Amino acid sequence: MKTRTIALLLALVMAVCCLTGCTSTRVRSYSEESSDASSDKYAAAMSAYKSNKKVMTIDGSPVYWNEYAYFLCAVMSNIERYGTQITDWSQVYDESTGKTYADLMTESVVNNIAWNHLVEIKAAENDVTFDAAGEQYVQDTIDQTIQNVVGDGGTESELNEKLKSYYMDLDLFKYFTKMQYLYNALASKLFGENGANITDEQVQEFAEENDYMTAKHILLKTTDDSGSALSDADKAAKKQQAEQIAAQVKAVADPDKRVELFDQLMEQYNEDTGEASYPHGYCFPSGSMVTEFEDACKALEPYEVSGVVESQHGYHVILRMPTQGDDLVVSSDGSQQTLQMLVAQQQLGSLLTGWVDEAEVTWEPKFRSIDYAAVFTPKESFWKRLDVFDWFEK
């Protein structure tokens, strides 16, 4: 399959993260769309065929309608979110290639599906098995999702109903979660546990290309536990304390001794309770921290300490640290992974892109040319777009 499409790789992570607390790549449910007509359209696509209707195979791995419909709805949702309304699927969207919106949709959906299936295929080829730990990972994810989406005492049956508004059912959600586990396991097999086989040179190249940096800080908050601002007098006292901390650290020239002192002062004064989970400091890409903190970090060399930096959170004293492979990367969903593992996942992603390009796609006869206008037509007008035999056959 030698095709490249627009960058709409929603991938398996989106299906899982959108329901387990991740906010950075969340797929909205169709009930969050702007109109009832839009909701009806997505519901129509999901039920256009039986969920277990075979659509195609990818390198021999079968793909069923529930998976195809999920990515179909997710890609459509993203297209519409950026202001494009497709009214004519035969309209050419790329004059240089002559490809239509129907071509765009098919290529985008197939590439996303192929990504998932090739994770499973390549895992098997590399003796990566879905073991008891994988089963537990899936069950833990389901339990957490029930807690988040259904509530205390919720059941898998209730979760299955909720999942319909995210273009999927429980079986598909379990499959995506399994693929997420296999993806991480395959990365560990190819690149070492937590990316241990990734070299320092590869880490530094990745950090520079993607603007990652690492820093420790001591935060003196200018709000109380309820979020209310401190008095001007209390703020002034906090600022003076921050200035004294900065001066004390700057007075130590030896890098190792400076870090040792900074750690001691962190333990004594730091009011950022989350930093304890990052023993080497926060490792983060540009754009993920408040501007004042990030700008101050960029201005520092490794082991250099800032003056007092004020942000909405309070007064910071920042110690820039060298970025290393075992640094824990800040994640929006609270999960942790090393920078080495992040590099390993990127390299696995590059491998998967090549495998997707080379994959053999074999369509079931009915789906060789999908009428997307008919698929997205709500049931009350379904008969106008698909013949009666197709209706009975689904």
Task: Give the ranges of each region predicted by the language model.
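Acidic surface patches and DE-rich sequence motifs
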Residues: 94, 224, 270, 284, ...
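Short, low-structural-confidence N-terminal segments
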Residues: 1-103, 107, 358, 362-394
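A generic structural-conservation signal
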Residues: 5, 132-134, 275, 306
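A mature extracytoplasmic/lumenal domain signature
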Residues: 60-62, 67-69, 132-134, 219-224, ...
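Charged, solvent-exposed helices and adjacent loops that form client-binding or oligomerization surfaces
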Residues: 74-105, 124-206, 232-237
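Peptidyl-prolyl cis-trans isomerase
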Residues: 244-293, 322, 328-330
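Solvent-exposed, polar/charged alpha-helical surfaces in well-ordered, non-transmembrane soluble domains
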Residues: 66, 70, 107-112, 116-124, ...
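PPIase-associated folding chaperone regions across multiple families
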Residues: 24-50, 158-237, 288-394
